[in-house]
């Protein structure tokens, strides 16, 4: 792979580059299109790790995505400065920052309500549906898309099909930004076989032609049937997510009183060492722990982004060859690598086992089961031109103009249902499921 091809300004669905808006590069337009999309806006009411809370300090998918985007922009610009002489003439270091920033903004845009438990609930429902014979008419590859449902693949569909220009390029982002978004540029056929991260894949069968087009335009080498090497900038987006995920889990753990401040402080001090800002040294006993943590967190992120940028540059040859094993965190050195690994371990041990989170996950299964039974059941009943019952006609009416056509293959019809349900916020999904079961909202 080479930077000249990897950083093309050409857009999906719009082959000719235009300069019709002064003051914004093609990559800035990508950023703005994601920010103004409805799918991005709805992240504000979707679970990150903990249930959407009355405590405004707890992260949602939206605040997490914004923070990841800030770190991603810094990473892209730092790498861009180092690689300045290797960039194409139309691209400067700030463009790399914007490309990575845009991909970071969109990295969770396809996640369903209720976070990772929502993904698992959808997979579980389709496994039961397969046992009932509901997926029998699909190909093995199509069936696999539902059995391994993945927010990354749904996000790729949102960006390339659903937002703005429906089924005509979607948001029409540049190939460079789409490549940087594609964390897993392969289909569900490889979700289990690769062993990289269980269940992970980035493209449904319905978007496979688009994946082929994007990887061809970017010069991403094909490694196997329906599997390609990753775009190098994906590793910066992934590192930004890992950095923020590790730190914000600890912050949320403090807010929910699942961790002691001294434990988090010790972890971050172990990373930054003596490189403490004067503002931190001047803090007194009357300063809040939130203020202390904010200052310490800022310095910690600086150290982690520096370490990730160094790892990227050190591994550039392997990255451009599509041969880097693992992620950038694995190639970081010293305190930075240990800090991220320890932060994730603390989250697993002390935060993810919280009873409130467990109850929320159980509720997610119930809510999504109600919705999937209703909408997929209605789509199945009308399949092949059959007349649905009055109840199922009314259920399909809720989908409006996005209701599946009776003559569509079941694969396409069920995807349309998933588009609707995965796009819901936690509160909207909960309220709709409650109303479908005849229960009124709590007063």
UniProtKB/Swiss-Prot annotation:
Superkingdom: Bacteria
Swiss-Prot/TrEMBL keywords: Hydrolase
Coiled-coil region list: none
CDD domains: HDc
InterPro entries, per database record: dGTP_triP_hydro_central_sf, dGTP_triphosphohydrolase_C, dGTPase, dGTPase-like, dNTPase_3, HD/PDEase_dom, HD_domain
Domain HD: residue ranges: 61-246
Single Gene Ontology MF annotation: dGTPase activity
Cell cycle listed as a keyword: no
One annotated GO biological process: dGTP catabolic process
HAMAP family associated with the record: dGTPase_type3
Family listed: Belongs to the dGTPase family. Type 3 subfamily.
NCBIfam families with a match to the protein in the record: dGTP_triPase (TIGR01353), PRK01096.1 (NF002205)
Protein name: Deoxyguanosinetriphosphate triphosphohydrolase-like protein
Species in which this protein is naturally found: Pseudomonas aeruginosa (strain ATCC 15692 / DSM 22644 / CIP 104116 / JCM 14847 / LMG 12228 / 1C / PRS 101 / PAO1)
């Amino acid at each position: 792979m080479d930077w000249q091809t990897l950083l093309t300004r050409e857009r999906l669905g719009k082959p000719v580059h235009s300069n019709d808006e002064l003051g914004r590069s093609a990559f800035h337009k990508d950023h703005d299109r994601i920010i103004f999309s409805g799918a991005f806006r709805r992240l504000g009411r979707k679970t990150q790790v903990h249930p959407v809370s009355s405590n405004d300090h707890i992260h949602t998918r939206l605040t997490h995505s914004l923070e990841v985007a800030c770190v991603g922009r810094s990473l892209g610009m730092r790498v861009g400065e180092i690689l300045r002489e290797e960039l194409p003439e139309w691209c400067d270091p700030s463009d790399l920052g914007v490309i990575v920033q845009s991909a970071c903004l969109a990295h969770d845009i396809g996640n369903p309500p209720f976070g990772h438990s929502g993904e698992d609930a959808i997979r579980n429902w389709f496994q039961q549906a397969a046992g009932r014979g509901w997926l029998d008419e699909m190909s093995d590859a199509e069936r696999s898309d539902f059995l391994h449902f993945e927010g990354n693949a749904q996000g790729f569909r949102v960006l390339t099909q659903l937002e703005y220009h429906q089924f005509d390029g979607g948001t029409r982002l540049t190939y460079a930004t789409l490549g940087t978004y594609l964390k897993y540029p392969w289909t569900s056929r490889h979700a289990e076989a690769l062993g990289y991260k269980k269940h992970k894949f980035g493209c449904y069968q319905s978007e496979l032609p688009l994946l082929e087009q994007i990887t061809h335009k970017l010069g991403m080498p094909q490694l196997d049937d329906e599997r390609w090497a990753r775009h190098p900038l994906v590793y910066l987006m992934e590192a930004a997510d890992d950095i923020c995920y590790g730190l914000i889990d600890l912050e949320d753990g403090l807010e929910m009183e699942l961790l002691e401040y001294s434990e988090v402080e010790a972890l971050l001090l172990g990373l930054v060492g003596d490189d403490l800002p004067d503002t931190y040294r001047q803090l007194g006993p009357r300063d809040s722990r939130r203020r202390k943590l904010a200052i310490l967190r800022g310095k910690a992120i600086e150290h982690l982004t520096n370490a990730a940028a160094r790892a990227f540059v050190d591994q550039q040859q392997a990255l451009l060859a599509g041969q880097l094993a693992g992620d950038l965190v694995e190639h970081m050195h010293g305190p930075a690598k240990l800090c991220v690994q320890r932060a994730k371990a603390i989250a697993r041990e002390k935060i993810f086992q919280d009873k409130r989170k467990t109850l929320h996950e159980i509720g997610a299964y119930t809510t999504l089961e109600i919705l999937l039974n209703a909408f997929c059941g209605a789509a199945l009943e009308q399949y092949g031109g059959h007349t649905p019952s009055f109840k199922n006609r009314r259920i399909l009416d809720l989908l409006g103009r996005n209701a599946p056509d009776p003559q569509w293959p079941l694969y396409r019809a069920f995807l349309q249902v998933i588009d609707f349900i995965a796009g819901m916020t936690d509160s909207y999904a909960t309220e709709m499921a409650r109303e479908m079961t005849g229960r009124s909202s709590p007063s």
